[in-house]
């Protein structure tokens, strides 16, 4: 996984996406960091509290809204867990594009 190409693809995509705001970007960057720590292997198990802390999102409603938006817009695949002992699963969608020189 080339994280430079992935992030370049992400920023190219959000530049044309009117539905994405800074909170979505912050959340995506936090999820990207978890994916990085997981050696870029899908799925990534996440904890709401940890992701909220890293992304600096203080409202659970905002967190869930942005997570569902990222899923609906095709940036991630989100599989919620309703078990407090088992984290939710996030699959990071490949956004890497060939970089034009």
Positions of PLM-derived features:
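Short recognition helix of helix-turn-helix/winged-helix DNA-binding domains
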Residues: 1-54, 72, 101
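Winged helix-turn-helix DNA-binding recognition segment
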Residues: 35-97
């Amino acid at each position: 996984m080339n994280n430079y190409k992935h992030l370049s693809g992400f920023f190219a995509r959000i530049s044309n996406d009117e539905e994405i705001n800074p909170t979505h970007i912050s959340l995506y960057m936090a999820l990207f960091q978890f994916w990085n720590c997981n050696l870029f292997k899908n799925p990534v198990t996440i904890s709401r509290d940890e992701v909220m802390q890293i992304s600096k999102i203080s409202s659970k409603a905002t967190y869930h809204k942005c997570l569902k938006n990222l899923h609906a817009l095709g940036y991630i695949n989100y599989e919620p867990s309703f078990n407090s002992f088992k984290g939710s699963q996030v699959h990071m969608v490949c956004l890497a594009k060939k970089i034009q020189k």
